[in-house]
Curated annotation (Swiss-Prot):
Tissue expression remark: Ubiquitous. Expressed in seedlings, roots, petioles, hypocotyls, reproductive organ tissues and leaves.
Polar residues bias spans: 197-209
Species of the source: Arabidopsis thaliana (Mouse-ear cress)
Keywords recorded for this protein, A-Z: Activator, DNA-binding, Nucleus, Transcription, Transcription regulation
Biased composition (Low complexity): 216-233
Protein name per UniProt: Nuclear transcription factor Y subunit A-2
């Protein structure tokens, strides 16, 4: 009977509450004893030494009885031989100190009683994204070596071109193309730095040149006055300075020279010339052919 009570005391159901898994401390037997009418005490009895009535139909040596009342009384809770009362789980005696209520997977050591802790953490270790392998030697196939080198060179060249484009975009050139820049340097500019319209200037210059050419052609096309005319023959006498004309006119040398100068230059504008009254009279006499003037 004593061995049976010991076995039942060792392998009885754990008396630990369900909230002990969340970190609460187990209650002491003194805290359970109190003047409370709604608290159910535990009374354990044994056959033989206690002298109480035992049901003949029950074959168990110990039984649990729940009753209301004062738990402090030692008569209601006798201590049998070989039976131990403890609020802790009997798993402590076997070496396990974990509560009966377990949590989920991240706390695997609590679920497996520390067995998994010997293997270390089971989480994945993320590798770095940029793994520098230039320092270490890389072994490749001999047939693929030249292709790998060629691709690496092309990638390096593309990266260099990209860097150059980035730098060129930062410092922009003042012109779009070098040929346009040279053409802009050759074009004439005005005082404000703007380009001059050379087409209109070329048209104006060609028009003035054409006008000048037409005037020279007109001057060249006009015949020069003849020195000797069949109708008006001139005879100059240097002694007396007089001139006899065939039509009966006698004019002094000074007047004749001035008249010849006037007649030899008909192209000049009349607005800038001042004709004396004597010259006008001589010209009228020559046209009429009936007067003789002497000075």
């Amino acid at each position: 009977m004593a061995m049976q009570t010991v076995r039942e005391g060792l392998f009885s159901a754990p008396q630990t509450s369900w909230w002990t898994a969340f970190g609460s401390q187990p209650l002491a037997p003194e805290s359970l004893a109190g003047d409370s009418d709604s608290f159910a005490g535990v009374k354990v009895g044994s056959v033989g030494e206690t002298g109480q009535r035992v049901d003949k139909q029950s074959n168990s040596a110990t039984h649990l009885a729940f009753s209301l009342g004062d738990v402090k009384s030692p008569r209601l809770v006798p201590k049998p031989h070989g039976a131990t009362f403890s609020m802790q789980s009997p798993c402590l005696e076997l070496g396990f100190s974990q509560p009966p209520i377990y949590t989920k997977y991240p706390y695997g050591e609590q679920q497996y009683y520390g067995v998994v802790s010997a293997y270390g953490s089971q989480s994945r270790v993320m590798l770095p994204l940029n793994m520098e392998t230039e320092d270490s030697t890389i072994y490749v196939n001999s047939k693929q070596y030249h292709g790998i080198i060629r691709r690496r060179q092309s990638r390096a060249k593309a990266a260099a071109v990209l860097d150059q484009k980035k730098l060129s975009s930062r410092c922009r050139k003042p012109y779009m193309h070098h040929s346009r820049h040279l053409h802009a340097l050759r074009r004439p500019r005005g005082s404000g730095g703007r380009f001059l319209n050379t087409k209109s200037q070329n048209l104006e210059n060609s028009g003035t040149n054409a006008k000048k050419g037409d005037g020279s052609m007109q001057i060249q096309s006009q015949p020069k006055p003849q020195q000797s005319n069949s109708q008006n023959s001139e005879v100059v006498h240097p002694e007396n300075g007089t001139m006899n004309l065939s039509n009966g006119l006698n004019v002094s040398g000074s007047e004749v020279t001035s008249m010849n100068y006037f007649l030899s230059s008909p192209v000049h504008s009349l607005g800038g010339m001042v004709m004396p009254s004597k010259w006008i009279a001589a010209a009228a006499a020559m046209d009429n052919g009936c007067c003789n003037f002497k000075t």
